[in-house]
Amino acid sequence: MMLEAAGRRVHVIQGEFKVVNDPDVVLSTILGSCVAACMRDPVSGVGGMNHFLLPGSSTSPASAGDATRYGVHLMELLINGLLKQGARRDRLEAKIFGGAKTIARFSNVGEQNAAFARQFLLDEGIRVVGESTGGEHGRKLEYWPVTGRARQYALTGVEAQRAIHQDQRPAPAPKPVESSIEFF
C-alpha cells in the first residue's frame, strides 16, 4: 500500500466506484479514454469516484458482467453509494476527468464518454464544478473526496501506453454469487 504524507491512497480501477468519508483518503486512478466522475456532498463530508470504459445507455441490455464497464451503471452506483452514506442529492457537486483520444485510428470514445458524463449530470441536476477532459494524453488522477481537491498529471511515454492498455482491457469478471448453481 502506498502512503502519502497526508493520507491513505485507494486506487479505483476500470469498472469500479469508491465512496469514502475519511479525510485522510485520496482516491486515485489512471485514465486514457475512460472517464472518472468525482462527486461529493460538501456538507456531509462524503465523496467518491467511479471509472467507466463506455457510456452505455439505459436501453442497451448489459449482462451482469458487462454492466460495470458502462457509465450509466457506474454513475447510478456512485450516486446511490453517496446517498447511503448521508449525502443529499441537492448538494452533490461533480468533477469530470479523462476522455482522451489515445488511439487516433479508433472512433473517439473518450469524447463520447465525457459528453455522456456531462449530460448525465445535467439531467440529474448535479452541478459540475470542474472538468478536464479530452486531449491526446492519458491522466493520472488524485481526488480527495471529503475536500473536493483534485490533482492530475499528464501521462506520456510508457505511462501513456500503460493507460491505453488498461482502457482496452475488459473489466474484471464479476465474482460468482454464492447461491449460484453450477452445472457439470
UniProtKB/Swiss-Prot annotation:
* Region listing for Disordered, in residue ranges: 165-184
The top EC class, named as a word, is hydrolase
Q: Which UniProt keywords apply?
A: Chemotaxis, Hydrolase
The Gene Ontology terms for molecular function here are:
protein-glutamine glutaminase activity
The record's catalysed reaction(s) read: L-glutaminyl-[protein] + H2O = L-glutamyl-[protein] + NH4(+)
Please provide the Gene Ontology terms (biological process) for this protein. Answer: chemotaxis
What domain of life?
A: Bacteria
- Lipid metabolism as UniProt keyword: no
The EC number(s) this enzyme carries: 3.5.1.44
Family of this protein = Belongs to the CheD family.
Under the heading PANTHER family, the entry gives: CHEMORECEPTOR GLUTAMINE DEAMIDASE CHED-RELATED (PTHR35147:SF2)
Tell me, in a sentence or two, what this protein's role is. Probably deamidates glutamine residues to glutamate on methyl-accepting chemotaxis receptors (MCPs), playing an important role in chemotaxis.
* Name by which UniProt lists this protein: Probable chemoreceptor glutamine deamidase CheD
Per the UniProt record, the source organism is Sinorhizobium fredii (strain NBRC 101917 / NGR234)
